């Protein structure tokens, strides 16, 4: 069976149970290991609420007991080495160079990120580098929320059978249907700063890391 390399990019600020649910579902559906790649400070989004090293460490803790999942620090390392902004297209160009032109590569992302893909650097180049697997997210309807310029690039690329992704190196889209999880990083951060209940959205190891390192305003809690 041809090999398949799956990368799940995100800010993971912090990584929560919704992220893990998507990664587990992709691992089961695609029968391939999932490498989660935390971004450096993303140029198209606000600066993360914790440092890149904190986000990487939380991600490592979250996947440490998850078969088939791993944390890949390549994007943080490249941003630190080159002292410049981090872009997904650069990561995928690097991965494609490493794995060669015939290897099947998948970039996994949530539907909420996908509908804003046209804000990413050189987003039109992505089909030449990778397949895209889009995980459904609460409140996102791709048929109605996809900008016209994205629809022109992507609408003819959808496939129904994920086996197509393994048998071709790049260029297709597939929708990962899994039970939507309402967890979000912004909700977790807001709950922490408001001294509300937040631990249920995180693994115990990540929750303890946040307490220990006083992240997201938790030091303001009495």
Swiss-Prot record:
Disulfide bond entries: none
Role summary: Catalyzes the reversible adenylation of nicotinate mononucleotide (NaMN) to nicotinic acid adenine dinucleotide (NaAD).
Associated pathway: Cofactor biosynthesis; NAD(+) biosynthesis; deamido-NAD(+) from nicotinate D-ribonucleotide: step 1/1
Enzyme nomenclature, EC number: 2.7.7.18
Keyword annotations of the record: ATP-binding, NAD, Nucleotide-binding, Nucleotidyltransferase, Pyridine nucleotide biosynthesis, Transferase
Similarity annotation: Belongs to the NadD family.
Annotated coiled-coil segments of the chain: none
MF-aspect GO terms: ATP binding; nicotinate-nucleotide adenylyltransferase activity
Reaction(s) the record says it catalyses: nicotinate beta-D-ribonucleotide + ATP + H(+) = deamido-NAD(+) + diphosphate
Entries under Pfam families matching the protein: CTP_transf_like (PF01467)
Organism encoding this protein: Xylella fastidiosa (strain 9a5c)
Protein name stated in the entry: Probable nicotinate-nucleotide adenylyltransferase
GO terms (BP aspect): NAD biosynthetic process
């Amino acid at each position: 069976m041809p090999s398949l390399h799956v990368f799940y990019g995100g800010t993971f600020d912090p990584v929560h149970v919704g992220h893990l649910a998507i990664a587990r579902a992709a691992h089961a559906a695609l029968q391939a290991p999932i490498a989660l790649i935390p971004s450096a400070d993303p140029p198209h989004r606000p600066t993360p609420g914790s440092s890149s090293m904190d986000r990487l460490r939380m991600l490592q803790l979250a996947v440490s007991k998850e078969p088939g999942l791993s944390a890949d620090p390549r994007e943080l390392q490249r941003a630190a080495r080159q002292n410049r902004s981090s872009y997904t297209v650069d990561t995928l160009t690097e991965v494609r160079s490493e794995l060669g032109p015939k290897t099947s590569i998948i970039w996994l992302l949530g539907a909420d990120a996908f509908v804003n893909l046209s804000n990413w650097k050189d987003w039109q180049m992505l089909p030449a580098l990778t397949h895209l697997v889009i995980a459904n997210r609460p409140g996102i309807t791709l048929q109605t929320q996809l900008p016209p310029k994205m629809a022109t690039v992507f609408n003819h690329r959808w496939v129904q059978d994920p086996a197509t992704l393994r048998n071709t190196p790049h260029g297709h889209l597939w929708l990962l249907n899994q039970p939507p999880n309402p967890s979000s990083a912004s909700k977790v951060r807001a709950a922490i700063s408001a001294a509300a209940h937040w631990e249920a959205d995180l693994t115990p190891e990540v929750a303890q890391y946040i307490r220990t390192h006083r992240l997201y305003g938790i030091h303001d809690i009495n």
